[in-house]
């Protein structure tokens, strides 16, 4: 869950609920949930089509299937594309979260951006250096728990601050046109069939065919337990995403309660308070860190812990997966019978450090 829900999800999904592209247009509302439904269907395909295949072939790297099915060139190409795409994607998500922490907190402490990045990467490097996937399973469990707890605490605080129940919040969101899930306009890019089918294939490609996402599943003892893990994960993921969307609606209700409104400022259409943009990725940090209205310090601390907890599972998993894929798929470490264990270990550590520097 932590690997799937990165810092991008943590700030962008709530921030996108009230997003309006132009004056007079309908908000995105809960339209993202259409994609989440597609995710769920995709996980069923992964659990009952791809996982049995991986277990039958006893794969350490899922790209070995390409070698067995299509030959060495397809194998190396698939692994290379994974390394390229995961490097770009993971560093982009890492940058977003560190940038938010830097802009809202660290910059005021006069800490340079490169120092912030170096400290985060050093922490990830230290606890993945020895443990690999085994360490990540435990650390990701803790970090994901903190992230979800932070999400629940923030939702509870919003409800308490506005003195409303969950039912009343949903009614207010409905009045603000923030509860629409399904887009029935076939000409729209958000048409529900497009979103659901797109979400399904995103999951099949970005989970079922991704070494980072599958490394934990194929390390489970047997196929039945791995499928059970995948199915329970997919159900929980649906509810966690729904909670993120509810938080997004509450954040906009809270922002409007504090005087924010849609307007054109300097020729730019957006959601502003006192001339400052508080929409999209800026919304959650602006509320949680007290920039819109004074909040208890504990809420700011909870937000920071939850945001960091959202950052680490996606970054550490990517670092470990990139290391294992490069060593096994590109260097062919398992087949290097002329290398002793000490040399193989030295190569693994060198690749691990190199991937950290690449980040």
Provide a role label for each language-model segment.
Residues 59-67, 131-142, 209-245, 314, ...:
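Hydrophobic, small-residue-rich membrane helices and short re-entrant helix-turn-helix hairpins
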Residues 277-312, 316, 333-347:
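Membrane-embedded translocation segments of transport machinery
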């Amino acid at each position: 869950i932590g690997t799937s829900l990165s810092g991008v999800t943590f700030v962008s999904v709530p921030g996108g609920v009230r997003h309006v592209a132009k004056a007079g247009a309908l908000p995105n509302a809960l339209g993202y949930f259409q994609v989440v439904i597609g995710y769920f269907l995709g996980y069923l395909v992964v659990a009952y089509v791809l996982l049995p295949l991986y277990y039958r072939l006893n794969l350490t790297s899922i790209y070995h299937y390409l070698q067995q099915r299509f030959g060495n060139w397809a194998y190396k190409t698939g692994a290379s594309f994974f390394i390229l795409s995961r490097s770009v994607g993971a560093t982009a998500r890492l940058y977003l979260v560190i940038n938010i922490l830097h802009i809202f907190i660290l910059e005021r402490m006069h800490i340079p951006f490169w120092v912030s990045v170096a400290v985060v990467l050093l922490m990830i490097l230290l606890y993945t250096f020895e443990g690999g996937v085994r360490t990540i399973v435990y650390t990701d469990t803790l970090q994901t728990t903190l992230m979800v707890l932070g999400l629940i605490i923030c939702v509870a605080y919003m409800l308490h601050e506005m003195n409303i129940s969950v039912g009343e919040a949903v009614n207010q969101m409905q009045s603000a046109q923030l509860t629409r899930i399904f887009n029935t306009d076939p000409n729209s890019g958000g048409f529900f069939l497009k979103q659901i089918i797109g979400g399904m294939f995103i999951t099949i490609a970005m989970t079922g065919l991704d070494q980072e996402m599958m490394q934990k599943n194929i390390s489970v003892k047997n196929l039945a337990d791995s499928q059970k893990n995948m199915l329970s994960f997919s159900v929980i993921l649906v509810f966690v995403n729904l909670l993120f969307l509810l938080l997004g609606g509450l954040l906009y209700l809270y922002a409007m309660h504090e005087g924010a409104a849609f307007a054109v400022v300097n020729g730019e259409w957006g959601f502003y308070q006192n001339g400052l943009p508080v929409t999209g990725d800026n919304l959650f940090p602006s509320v949680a860190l007290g920039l819109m209205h004074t909040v208890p310090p504990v809420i700011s601390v909870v937000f920071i812990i939850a945001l960091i907890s959202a950052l680490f599972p996606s970054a550490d998993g990517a670092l470990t997966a990139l290391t294992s894929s490069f060593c096994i798929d590109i260097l062919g470490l398992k087949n290097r019978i002329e290398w002793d264990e000490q040399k193989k270990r030295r190569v693994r550590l060198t690749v691990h450090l190199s991937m950290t520097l690449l980040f």
